[in-house]
């Protein structure tokens, strides 16, 4: 896992260069939004169960997927879906705090699409629920922090597409 600071320093180090003005500006932006990211993470942590509940209600609860024969019909499958949504929310929050999506590749997306396909998990419904989670989260943390979180929710969706 990297953060925005490590990523730019590693890049400059590999190139054997000092930090130039564009890198310094990128770091300034990261530090200027630090308090916003920390407040958003605290709000998400305090409301995680509600975010997931609302996202499921908004995207999956009354669809064919939860009816008999649907992929979330049994309690076990439903619980697995909720567990996965919790992972996505938690790791998107970590990425937002770090300002870097690498943890999503390492801990969430690496092999996930293939695993879902082999288990018959509907990727479209998963993406729909992540998008709903993005909307619910944004309404809680505000538009600026919601936009930042949206980057990482979209990254997960893109990795699953």
UniProtKB/Swiss-Prot annotation:
SUPFAM superfamilies tied to this protein: Globin-like
Domain of life: Eukaryota
N4-methylasparagine modified-residue sites: 71
CDD domains reported in the protein's UniProt record: APC_beta (cd12126)
PTM annotation: Contains one covalently linked phycocyanobilin chromophore.
Keywords, alphabetical: Antenna complex, Bile pigment, Chloroplast, Chromophore, Electron transport, Membrane, Methylation, Photosynthesis, Phycobilisome, Plastid, Thylakoid, Transport
Binding of (2R,3E)-phycocyanobilin, residues: 81
Localization in the cell: Plastid, Chloroplast thylakoid membrane
Cited Pfam families: Phycobilisome
GO CC field: chloroplast thylakoid membrane; phycobilisome
Primary localisation category: plastid
NCBIfam families referenced in this protein's UniProt entry, alphabetically: apcB
Family assignment from sequence similarity: Belongs to the phycobiliprotein family.
PANTHER family xref list: ALLOPHYCOCYANIN BETA CHAIN (PTHR34011:SF3), PHYCOBILISOME 32.1 KDA LINKER POLYPEPTIDE, PHYCOCYANIN-ASSOCIATED, ROD 2-RELATED (PTHR34011)
More info: Although originally identified as Cyanidium caldarium, these sequences derive from Galdieria sulphuraria.
Protein name as annotated: Allophycocyanin beta chain
Organism encoding this protein: Galdieria sulphuraria (Red alga)
